[in-house]
Every structure is written in C-alpha cells, then in structure tokens.
C-alpha cells in the first residue's frame, strides 16, 4: 500500500459571514440554476424561466408581467431583493413571458393576430402541464394580473393564492376607448405605455427608474410586439366580478397598488368586488406605478405574511418592518375591527387568515 500523503487545502474564498453578501451569493447561484423552456400553446410559444426546483407539497410561484416589459424588467428587482432569497429557496419560481415579449424574440410580421388576454390566460394550463405543477401562487402585474384573475375564474382548483398588482378587472368603456383613440393621435405608443406603467408625478419627475424604462421601451427592437400585447390589454373584457355572486376569486388574494398610481381607483374598485375574508389590500406610499420595482422590501414583507397565512414558511424570520407593521381592516362589511399584521401569520392548518388592509 502506498504511503498516504498529507495534502493542505487552502480556501480561496472563505465562508461569508456578512448576511448581505450571503444573500447576494445565493441570488447569483439561483441565476446560474435558471432553466429556460419554450412551450408550445394553441396561442403561440411562451418562454418560461425556472428558478429552483419543485418542492413536495408546495405550490409553484408563477409570475406574469405587464405590457411594455418582459419578466426581467418587471420582476428582477423584486426577486433579486435580498429577503426574497428566503422565499425563493422554499418554492420553485416560474416566470412566464407572453408570446413575443421576451428579449431576443422574433418580430411579428404586420397583420399578425396576437392572442387576447383571455387566450393568454389559457396558455397557463399548458405551462403547468408541461412543468407538472399541480398548484400555484400567481403574481401578476397590470395585464399579467388580469390574466391570472381570468385564469383563476376557470381553474380555481389549481390556484392556492394570488398577488395582483395594478389590476383593472373592467373592460374599457366607450369614453375610455374614445380618449385612448384621441391620445393615440398625439402620443406615441411608448408614451402611452409609460403612462400606463408610471404615475404623472413619476413621469414629470423623470426619476432614474422612469428614464431606465423609457430608454428600454424606446430602444427595444420589439416595440411592435409590445404594441400587440398593449392592444390586447386595451381590448380586455370585463371580468364581471361580484362580491357574494357566482363570479369571484375564491382563493386568498393580495391586491397591491401604489398611492396615487394610475390604477389606484381600479384596484380599490376590485377590492370592493372580492370576498373581504379572503382579500388583502395593500396600498403602498412612495411607490408610484410599479411597487415591485420601487418598493421591493415592503412588498417582500407583505408577501411573506401572505404565504405564512396560507400555512407556508411558518418559521421564517421576520424583520422589524413585518413585526411592527400595524394595520386596520377596511370598514366595509365585517372588516371594521383592528389588529396587527402579525396576527395574520398565526394561522396553522386552518383556513388562511387574510392580511388586513394596509397603507405603508
């Protein structure tokens, strides 16, 4: 037997002790582990990006982006936020890009018949079947929020919860349609999409975020594809949601909108049409039209409570914000009593306790 030799191993990168650096490393590892799939559906090819691996007895977190952007532009800031690493490691995450909206997509020829939002909602079953996801928690923004709501109305048994940011469940009325036509005579498609994404104050202030997204839309080779998705959004049908009626979302729902955002009134109206025992309403101050981009920390905390209320991540560490946030229920219906947000995370195996209405 040959003589054993002593080998000294020097660690080039010592273990990280800084939590922030550890979170950054985890985020980088997740990026390395990303998997992309192109999935054929009856309404075109959708590209999905997977982070992590499916967890037994846990739903997948599935996202759907708004108009004028792909999943990276819409969700990267939120999912790369350090505290989101804690959530991502507990679930598999699937980002759906609407047909023709992802970076590197081919430009559609003139006259291409783009799917309606109702048809885009029917691409989700194809994605879930392809990836073998039995149930999901959906996170949608703008058009993506509408698509998830529409999907859930037809496939409620596969949806455990929804986070709907900037949702407008109503069809455009004749006055809205006429105003849109007149606006189209004086504004470019990029200006109209920016007016949908950001508040008037944000646009006039021309913040770094606004400048970044304005440049991204203006310089995109996919601007004609963006317009097709935009046209489908503006042609959406009324979801006809009704509190206590036959058409409603029966799973836990967290509605999110920025204070003074373009869609604030629409989200408030949507809140009035949903079951108050299943619905949380988060109005975020200083977040503008895209709270998942401008206030990822606050949204992450709210989302942690949301999934804890569903019985997941019961042992997760809460930051000072989540421990101390005080909320009061809406005065509508039975939502007149007050409580702190921490009470909503005490749910065990019983029905999910809704978050309270919060302004933060």
UniProtKB/Swiss-Prot annotation:
Contributes to the regulation of the Wnt signaling pathway. Down-regulates CTNNB1-mediated transcriptional activation of target genes. May be involved in neuron differentiation. It comes from the Eukaryota. Residues 325-360 are annotated as: Disordered. It is found in: Cytoplasm. This is Protein NDRG2. GO terms for cellular component: cytoplasm. Belongs to the NDRG family. GO terms for biological process: cell differentiation; nervous system development; Wnt signaling pathway. Keywords: Cytoplasm, Developmental protein, Differentiation, Neurogenesis, Wnt signaling pathway. InterPro entries: AB_hydrolase_fold, NDRG.
């Amino acid at each position: 037997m040959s003589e054993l030799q002593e080998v000294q191993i020097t660690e080039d990168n010592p273990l990280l002790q800084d939590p922030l650096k550890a979170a950054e490393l985890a985020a980088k590892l997740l990026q390395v582990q990303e998997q992309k799939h192109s999935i054929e559906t009856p309404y075109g090819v959708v590209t999905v990006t997977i982070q992590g691996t499916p967890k037994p007895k846990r739903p997948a977190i599935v996202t759907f982006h708004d108009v004028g952007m792909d999943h990276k532009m819409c969700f990267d800031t939120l999912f790369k936020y350090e505290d989101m690493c804690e959530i991502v490691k507990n679930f598999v995450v699937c980002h759906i890009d609407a047909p023709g909206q992802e970076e590197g997509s081919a430009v559609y020829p003139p006259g291409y018949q783009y799917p309606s939002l109702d048809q885009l909602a029917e691409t989700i079953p194809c994605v879930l079947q392809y990836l073998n996801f039995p149930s999901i928690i959906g996170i949608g923004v703008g058009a993506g929020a509408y698509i998830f709501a529409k999907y859930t109305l037809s496939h409620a048994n596969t949806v455990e919860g929804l986070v709907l940011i900037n949702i407008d469940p109503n069809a455009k009325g004749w006055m809205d349609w006429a105003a849109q036509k007149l606006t189209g005579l004086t504004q470019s498609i990029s200006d109209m999409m920016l007016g949908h994404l950001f508040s008037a104050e944000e646009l006039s202030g021309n913040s770094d975020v606004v400048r970044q997204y304005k440049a991204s839309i203006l310089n995109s080779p996919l601007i004609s594809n963006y317009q097709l998705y935009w046209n489908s959004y503006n042609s959406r049908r009324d979801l006809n949601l009704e509190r206590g009626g036959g058409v409603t979302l029966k799973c836990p729902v967290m509605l999110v909108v920025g204070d003074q955002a373009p869609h604030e009134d629409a989200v408030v109206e949507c809140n009035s049409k949903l079951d108050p025992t299943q619905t949380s309403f988060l109005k975020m101050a200083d977040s503008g039209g895209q709270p998942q981009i401008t206030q990822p920390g606050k949204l992450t905390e709210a989302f942690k409570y949301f999934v804890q209320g569903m019985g997941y991540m019961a042992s997760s560490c809460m930051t000072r914000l989540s421990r101390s946030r005080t909320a009061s229920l809406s005065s509508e219906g039975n939502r007149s009593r007050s409580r702190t947000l921490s009470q909503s995370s005490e749910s065990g195996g019983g029905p999910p306790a809704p978050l309270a209405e919060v302004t933060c």
